[in-house]
Amino acid sequence: MFLTRSEYDRGVNTFSPEGRLFQVEYAIEGHKLGSTAIGIQTSEGVCLAVEKRITSPLMEPSSIEKIVEIDAHIGCAMSGLIADAKTLIDKARVETQNHWFTYNETMTVESVTQAVSNLALQFGEEDADPGAMSRPFGVALLFGGVDEKGPQLFHMDPSGTFVQCDARAIGSASEGAQSSLQEVYHKSTTLKEAIKSSLIILKQVMEEKLNATNIELATVQPGQNFHMFTKEELEEVIKDI
């Protein structure tokens, strides 16, 4: 006799008769409550743009980090439970440094994503990695960087599944943003056009008026390190949209 749905809910490693892991599905839905993030890959580099939700005028906007540097050639944008993201970010940073010390070369964007994916898959295991949790991570990540294959963009969801993308949106307005990306993206898109498109789409889906304090923007280009836009640089870019 099959258990009820609520009883399948309690076990993170138990499949339902329909072949579903409800806790993983809930985590995937949970990350959609986070702020919207957009990543676009071009031949000139990768851009990451994220909405920052300032819930109180007493909050310091600069203390909210939605885009972080993994290594000099890789950045990461997040949406969902930021505390969960910190664990995955730490894992990615440790992996890139260990790879450098061991092989004297930078780690590829795909390998970094794979390492983080392996940790995300270890939920509920007794002998798992020390960073693993007893439940799925409630966060989706966009890894953007440049390696020997050129500019790369990877999306990883809470199930640990990752896939390479030309352009991707995650977060609360991801469906509308993804539709807009499909309309504006083409293989010949320049980095400047990608930056402009990502901000225009964020402007369309954000509830508040877009300004230099409620978004974050970063780029990674061949031959150049990860670059996070300053408030002054953001104001210049926003003037053009």
UniProtKB/Swiss-Prot annotation:
This one is known as Proteasome subunit alpha type-5
Q: Where in the cell is it found?
A: Cytoplasm; Nucleus
What does the entry list under GO cellular component? cytoplasm; nucleus; proteasome complex; proteasome core complex; proteasome core complex, alpha-subunit complex
Task: Please name the NCBIfam families in this protein's record.
Answer: PRK03996.1 (NF003075)
In the UniProt record, which residues carry a glycan?
Answer: 198
Could you describe the subunit structure of this protein?
A: The 26S proteasome consists of a 20S proteasome core and two 19S regulatory subunits. The 20S proteasome core is a barrel-shaped complex made of 28 subunits that are arranged in four stacked rings. The two outer rings are each formed by seven alpha subunits, and the two inner rings are formed by seven beta subunits. The proteolytic activity is exerted by three beta-subunits PSMB5, PSMB6 and PSMB7. PSMA5 interacts directly with the PSMG1-PSMG2 heterodimer which promotes 20S proteasome assembly.
Give the sites modified to Phosphothreonine. 55
Native source species:
Rattus norvegicus
The family database entries (InterPro entries) matched by this protein are listed as: Ntn_hydrolases_N (IPR029055), Proteasome_alpha (IPR050115), Proteasome_alpha-type (IPR023332), Proteasome_alpha_type_5 (IPR033812), Proteasome_asu_N (IPR000426), Proteasome_sua/b (IPR001353)
The Swiss-Prot or TrEMBL record describes its family as follows:
Belongs to the peptidase T1A family.
Q: Which domain of life is it from?
A: Eukaryota
Q: Any one Gene Ontology biological process term?
A: proteasome-mediated ubiquitin-dependent protein catabolic process
Task performed by this protein: Component of the 20S core proteasome complex involved in the proteolytic degradation of most intracellular proteins. This complex plays numerous essential roles within the cell by associating with different regulatory particles. Associated with two 19S regulatory particles, forms the 26S proteasome and thus participates in the ATP-dependent degradation of ubiquitinated proteins.
Residue positions of the PTM N-acetylmethionine?
Answer: 1
Entry-annotated residues carrying Phosphoserine: 16, 56, 63
